[in-house]
């Protein structure tokens, strides 16, 4: 009698049944969720990761940790995909998804060992998830009414920043709020996160970080002119030089007059071009490639500032910031193609010369956060915190509702779902109860990473909630229950709801797998996927 392995090519692997497939998959997801779980919360531990390119990452950002780990186990990969989906949709809450999915599956493993069938567990999880979606709206503790209110927005951002940069949350929240409000369109729902740029400059401390209304490029201007005010700006994507023919040409020169005339023709051509550009009122020229010395000489003579930006991505962003049209042909631009900037100057930040395009009008197209820090790892980590903060702001533009943070929402959800389990007949009540208990992992982890007794902390929060203080979460400083509205620990409603749905669906998908069939991989290592050409995209 033929077995499955006889039908497949040599080297194929096959796992089936509860022990070999389901529990093995659950174990793989547990291993991955254990890695990120200890990074949860303000006192989350950092991970030191060296990726396939030998680049070092020291971070507690789950999205970065998961992206840089080269996970190959199929079940763990599903968890990675869920985290990536959360990152793409919400920009925050990746660790929440991974930790919660891992805990759901841990609880499911307990039920499987008790003898429950996977389909009964899945039914219970689906019922619990549906019930939670019904009751979650009654658990909203704060609603942001005015997105332009700096004080209120800063309060809502603090929680997201504290989980990445604890101690700097007040300062960074204000910085992010200022940057976001500078580029906020009249219709807040159209807010674009790409309009808030980050420029990292080593040196100084985190508190030296500042916001500039406009665009900052860490490079010096060409030539001697380093500052222009109320400037019309022409942007050329190519170099400023005479065009060269594709064919090689030979010139026969018989006397010295012909030699003088030959070079004079080149000079006249460049002078005419620069004169034509200067006559349009242009004060700043931006070039996308090299600039000849002769062209630079005439540009200086007309007192025009010259900036050379070789990255096409940076060039595109500058055009957006100043409202210019990038030109592909060297010549005098028409007024509609010119950009405008209130101030273009070269400033030394630390020891780095930066070209700043500053706009003084009320609404700017782009605002830039200039991040300072002692090491590149700190700069990268602050950039990730800012990225999360900007994404939370974008979420607030669409939905200003907030749930209690600090584990308060999870404990209240657990209480209500356990009451629902008691009222549910049949075997699914066991899986509903385990689903409810899984939420305790969040306050438990917050207590553990803060150095408090997790069991005591959870029982104290339960006691506070039983007395009717449903907004009480864990105060990580004292380890005692405290109102989240006093601590300003708020979690975005949309992000948390999406994360819970994603975690429930991922856990159910893993539980539905009863066989794993893997063909023999092709020889040789697979090349890593190409990322974006521009590191900032």
From Swiss-Prot:
<keyword id="KW-0547">Nucleotide-binding</keyword>
<keyword id="KW-0963">Cytoplasm</keyword>
<comment type="similarity">
    <text>Belongs to the TCP-1 chaperonin family.</text>
</comment>
<dbReference type="InterPro" id="IPR002423">
    <property type="entry name" value="Cpn60/GroEL/TCP-1"/>
</dbReference>
<keyword id="KW-0067">ATP-binding</keyword>
<dbReference type="InterPro" id="IPR027409">
    <property type="entry name" value="GroEL-like_apical_dom_sf"/>
</dbReference>
<comment type="subunit">
    <text>Heterooligomeric complex.</text>
</comment>
<dbReference type="GO" id="GO:0016887">
    <property type="term" value="F:ATP hydrolysis activity"/>
</dbReference>
<dbReference type="GO" id="GO:0051082">
    <property type="term" value="F:unfolded protein binding"/>
</dbReference>
<dbReference type="InterPro" id="IPR017998">
    <property type="entry name" value="Chaperone_TCP-1"/>
</dbReference>
<protein>
    <recommendedName>
        <fullName>T-complex protein 1 subunit theta</fullName>
    </recommendedName>
</protein>
<dbReference type="InterPro" id="IPR027413">
    <property type="entry name" value="GROEL-like_equatorial_sf"/>
</dbReference>
<dbReference type="Pfam" id="PF00118">
    <property type="entry name" value="Cpn60_TCP1"/>
</dbReference>
<dbReference type="GO" id="GO:0005524">
    <property type="term" value="F:ATP binding"/>
</dbReference>
<comment type="function">
    <text>Molecular chaperone; assists the folding of proteins upon ATP hydrolysis. Known to play a role, in vitro, in the folding of actin and tubulin.</text>
</comment>
<dbReference type="InterPro" id="IPR012721">
    <property type="entry name" value="Chap_CCT_theta"/>
</dbReference>
<dbReference type="InterPro" id="IPR027410">
    <property type="entry name" value="TCP-1-like_intermed_sf"/>
</dbReference>
<dbReference type="GO" id="GO:0006457">
    <property type="term" value="P:protein folding"/>
</dbReference>
<keyword id="KW-0143">Chaperone</keyword>
<dbReference type="InterPro" id="IPR002194">
    <property type="entry name" value="Chaperonin_TCP-1_CS"/>
</dbReference>
<dbReference type="GO" id="GO:0005832">
    <property type="term" value="C:chaperonin-containing T-complex"/>
</dbReference>
<dbReference type="GO" id="GO:0140662">
    <property type="term" value="F:ATP-dependent protein folding chaperone"/>
</dbReference>
């Amino acid at each position: 009698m033929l077995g499955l392995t006889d039908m497949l090519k040599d080297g194929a692997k096959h796992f089936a049944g509860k022990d070999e497939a389901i529990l093995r998959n659950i174990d793989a997801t547990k291993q991955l969720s254990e890695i990120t779980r200890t990074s949860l919360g303000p006192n989350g531990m950092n991970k030191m990761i060296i990726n396939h390119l030998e680049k070092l990452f020291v971070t507690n950002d789950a999205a970065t940790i998961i992206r840089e780990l080269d996970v190959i186990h199929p079940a763990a990969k599903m968890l990675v995909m869920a985290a990536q989906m959360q990152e793409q949709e919400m920009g925050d809450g990746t660790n929440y998804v991974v930790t919660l999915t891992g805990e759901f599956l841990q609880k499911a493993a307990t039920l499987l060992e008790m003898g429950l069938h996977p389909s009964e567990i899945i039914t219970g999880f689906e019922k619990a998830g549906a019930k939670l979606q019904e009751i979650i709206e009654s658990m909203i503790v704060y609603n942001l009414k005015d997105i332009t209110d700096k004080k209120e927005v800063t309060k809502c951002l603090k929680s997201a920043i504290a989980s990445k940069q604890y101690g700097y949350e007040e300062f960074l929240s204000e910085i992010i709020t200022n940057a976001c409000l500078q580029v906020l369109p009249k219709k807040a729902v159209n807010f674009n996160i790409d309009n808030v740029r980050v420029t990292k400059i080593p040196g100084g401390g985190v508190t030296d970080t500042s916001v500039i209304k406009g665009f900052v490029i860490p490079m010096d201007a060409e030539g001697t002119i380093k500052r222009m005010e109320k400037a019309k700006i022409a942007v050329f994507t190519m170099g400023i030089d005479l065009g060269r023919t594709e064919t090689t040409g030979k010139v026969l020169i018989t006397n010295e007059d012909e030699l003088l005339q030959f070079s004079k023709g080149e000079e006249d051509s460049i002078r005419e071009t620069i004169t034509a550009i200067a006559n349009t009122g242009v004060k700043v020229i931006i070039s996308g490639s090299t600039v000849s010395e002769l062209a630079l000489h005439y540009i200086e003579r007309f007192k025009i500032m010259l900036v050379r930006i070789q990255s096409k991505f940076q060039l595109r962003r500058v055009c957006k910031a100043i409202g210019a049209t990038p030109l592909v042909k060297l010549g005098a631009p028409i007024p509609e193609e010119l950009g405008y900037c209130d101030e273009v100057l070269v400033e030394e930040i630390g020891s780095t010369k930066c070209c700043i395009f500053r706009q003084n009008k009320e609404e700017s197209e782009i605002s830039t956060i200039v991040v300072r820090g002692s090491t590149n790892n700190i700069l990268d980590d602050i950039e990730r915190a800012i990225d999360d903060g900007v994404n939370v702001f974008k979420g607030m533009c669409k939905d200003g509702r907030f749930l209690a943070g600090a584990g308060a929402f999870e404990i209240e959800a657990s209480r209500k779902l356990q009451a629902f389990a008691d009222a549910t007949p049949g075997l699914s009540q066991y899986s509903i109860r385990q689903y409810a208990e899984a939420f305790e992992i969040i306050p438990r982890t917050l207590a553990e990473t803060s150095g408090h007794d997790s069991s005591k902390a959870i029982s104290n929060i339960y006691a506070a909630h039983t007395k009717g203080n449903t907004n009480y979460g864990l105060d990580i400083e004292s380890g005692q229950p405290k109102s989240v509205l006093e601590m300003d620990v708020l979690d975005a409603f949309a992000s948390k709801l999406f994360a819970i749905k994603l975690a429930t669906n991922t856990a159910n998908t893993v539980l539905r797998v009863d066989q794993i069939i893997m063909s023999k991989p092709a020889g040789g290592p697979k090349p890593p996927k190409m990322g974006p050409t521009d590191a900032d995209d």
